[in-house]
Amino acid sequence: DAKTQIKMHSTAGEFIREVEFPGIGSASGFGGKRTDTETFYSFSSFATPPSIYRYDMLTGNSKLIRRSNAKADPEDFEVKQVFYKSKDGTRVPMFIAHKRGIELNGKNPVLLYGYGGFNISLTPRFSISRLAWMEMGGVFAMPNLRGGGEYGEEWHRGGTKANKQNVFDDFIAAA
């Protein structure tokens, strides 16, 4: 659902566990040899600056190794993923991020950002300008419009050529 999810399996294909991340966000950089018992990854979210973690594959624990200098406390913000219906009834995911404690009553300024094209996936990533927006009481909303790569080729084709109107309908429905 447009956020990183990692499931660990044995070399025989048996499910071991799901990797837990510090929140809804994007992780990358996993790698290693078959004999390694740890790996490193980068994690970032709307409220978490890029951070490097060490993941122990034996215990399933992640340990923060390094975080960028951006002055942001992820605990000060709330990030959630919701789903809404577009004009044609298609279920579309959207991330909503804001400062913790803000009442979402329709009176908050909202920055609605979307892109639905060229099979490009929009995932939760850190941005200092979005963080400043949320610090000042703004709400950041990012729908995953058809045309992107979040759900594979069918989702991508659903927002291209003769289906391009779906991208605009998805965005309007998000508002």
Model-assigned labels for residue ranges:
Residues 2-8, 47-54:
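Structural motif
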Residues 1, 35-45:
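Short beta-strand elements that form the blades of beta-propeller/WD-repeat-like
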Residues 8-10, 43, 54-56, 98:
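Residue-level signal for short segments within beta-strands and strand-turn junctions
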Residues 1-2, 66:
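Peripheral terminal and inter-domain segments
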